Amino acid sequence: GLGALSERYDHELYEKAYAHCDVLIIGAEPAGLMAALTAGRAGLDVILADEHDQLGGRLLSEMEHIDGMPAAAWVQAAVAELAGFANVRIMANTTVTGAYDQGVFGALERVGLGVEALPEGLPRETFWRIYTKGAILCAGALERQIAFANNDRPGIMAAGAMRSYLNRFGVSPGQRVAIFGNNADAHRTARDFAQAGVEVVAMIDSRAEAQ
């Protein structure tokens, strides 16, 4: 079952680099963006690192409002403000890989992610050693699947994934959906699908006190 290693020579460039900051913010979901805005406005040297190419995390897939704006519009405004700060560095496509002694963090920046032919001299990846006075972990939450038989069959999805399809990409996972959950996230999913005109045939909540 072992595959064969490629014998082709890797012509890509891989670099290492160093950076220094007052505060390293890991993750650019809502908490990370607010932390970066607060630190940036206070004049601190900030590095905001996120493993995705777009900042905002779950807000890009939600219909909620922040400060009177749709979540995605709020993200755009926040990112635009951060980009205007000379003391804030945004590192997208960057995964913080470890925390070490003396405030040192390792981070892998995938510079050429999604680029088939890189410009000459541009590395495919850069490994950063970041020296910081403090760090804030804002990695977000991970939705836990509910365990039941055959929960990995086609058509069975996590609620967050369904809302990402619907709200972020404009695609419905189906014409008729049944939703099962044990928290308010399930009701949020049912609301979004109903507002989009998708038939919600069942809303099942395991909590006795749910309304």
Task: Give residue ranges: language-model regions.
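Residues forming the flavin
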Residues: G1-Q211
